[in-house]
Amino acid sequence: MALYVSMVWRKILRKRWVLGVVFGLSLIYFLTSTFKQEERTVRDRMLLQTGDQDQNLQWKVQFNLGNSSRISNQCRNSVQGKLLVTDDMGYICERKELLANGCCNINVASTKLYSCETCLPNGCCSVYEFCVSCCLQPNKQLQLERFLNKAAVAFQNLFQAVEDHFELCLAKCRTSSQSVQHENTYRNPIAKHCYGESPPELLPI
C-alpha cells in the first residue's frame, strides 16, 4: 500500500501544473511573511516616536527609594548577560558573584551600585547591564517620568507589562528601532542601550 501511494505521489509531482501550484503557494507565503515583518517594523518605529504633548496618564511604575525599599531577601535581575548581571536594587556584578537569591554579592569589591560606566551623558550606554544600573538611580525618576508622560499613549502596548522602576529600565535599555539608523545599522553601534528620552546620537556612515 505504501509503495502504491509513493508511486502515485511521484506521478503527481512530475506534472508541471502541480509544481507550479506548489511554487505559487510558496511564493505567496514568502511575500506574506515579508510584508507582515515589514509592517511590524514600521509599526514599532512609529510607536517609538515620542509625542510632543504631555499625557497625564496613570502608570503603575513605582520608583526605588534606595536599599530601604527591599521587602524580601530575593532579587530579580537582568538574567541575560553572560558576564555581567544587574539586580533590581541597582547593583551590577560579575555573573560569578550572583548569589542564589538572585542578588549581587555586595561584599565583593567589583560589585557596584548605580554604575554609569560605559554610559554617555545622553543616557546611552554600550553595555546593557550598565544601562539598567544607571537607569535605576533615584535621581533618574524625573527623567523617566517625563519620558513616560510624553510616550504614554504610543508605548501603552509595549510597556503594558511594566510594573516598577526595575522593569521599566529593563525595557527601556533594550535596543529598539530608536537605536537603528538604517535597517541593519545602529545610529551609534558603541552606545545603543538607552534609558534617556532621546535616541542615540546619529553617527556619519
Curated annotation (Swiss-Prot):
> Which residue ranges does the entry give as Lumenal-facing topology?
36-205
Domain of life of the source: Eukaryota
Q: Recite the UniProt keywords alphabetically.
A: Glycoprotein, Golgi apparatus, Membrane, Transmembrane, Transmembrane helix
Q: Which residues lie on this side of the membrane: Cytoplasmic?
A: 1-16
- Which GO BP terms, alphabetically? positive regulation of SREBP signaling pathway
Q: Which residues are glycosylated?
A: N67
Major location (coarse): Golgi
Transmembrane ranges? 17-35
What does the record say about its membrane topology?
Answer: Single-pass membrane protein
**Cellular component GO terms, alphabetical:** Golgi membrane
* Localization per record: Golgi apparatus membrane
InterPro entries to which the protein is assigned, alphabetical: SPRING1 (IPR019352)
The UniProt function text for this chain reads:
Positively regulates hepatic SREBP signaling pathway by modulating the proper localization of SCAP (SREBP cleavage-activating protein) to the endoplasmic reticulum, thereby controlling the level of functional SCAP.
- Recorded family membership: Belongs to the SPRING family.
Query: Which PANTHER family does this chain map to?
Result: SREBP REGULATING GENE PROTEIN (PTHR13481:SF0)
- Name-wise, this protein is SREBP regulating gene protein
Q: Which organism is it from?
A: Xenopus laevis
Q: What is the lineage of its organism?
A: Eukaryota, Metazoa, Chordata, Craniata, Vertebrata
